[in-house]
């Protein structure tokens, strides 16, 4: 008996790689067979693990990436950019709303400042601040000691003094 002749192209490859097979053993896997020697064989009548129709694993993501990816990318990009554009529009509208609220709040703050200012000027004109009492403070020099010094009694009136009005804000100040 003679042994079958081996293909000269594959002669010696078994010694180089433990995973190589002779050409006559290369064939498509049959039903129920594994696709490679590294995956376990499935039971007869069922799909191998990780196949496209496996209900537990869902569709194989590599299939979509390699086979259909070139057709889906432009749509995905448009969809992604459309979502980004809608988020930008929404953010701009929120920003504009916040700007309007800020303007209203600034107007309210200005109104409150005017109210406080008006209340402060009305009480300042009727009452004397504690830093400036009604009676003149005695100085170190008395009018008798230095007759050349002017007296404050001659310039004082019944209302607030001129010097007091100069330091306080006047009521005729224009409103903002």
Curated annotation (Swiss-Prot):
Where along the chain is composition biased (Low complexity)?
137-161
* Keywords noted in UniProt: Coiled coil, Host nucleus, Host-virus interaction, Phosphoprotein, Virion
Impact noted for substituting residue 97 to A: Complete loss of VP1, VP2 and VP3 expression
User: Where does the UniProt annotation locate this protein?
Assistant: Virion; Host nucleus
**What stretches pass through the bilayer?**
none
> Where do the segments described as Disordered lie?
1-85, 116-176
- GO cellular component terms, A-Z: host cell nucleus; virion component
What happens on changing residue 137 to A? Complete loss of VP1, VP2 and VP3 expression
Q: How does it assemble?
A: Interacts with VP1.
Q: What is this protein called?
A: Avian agnoprotein 1a
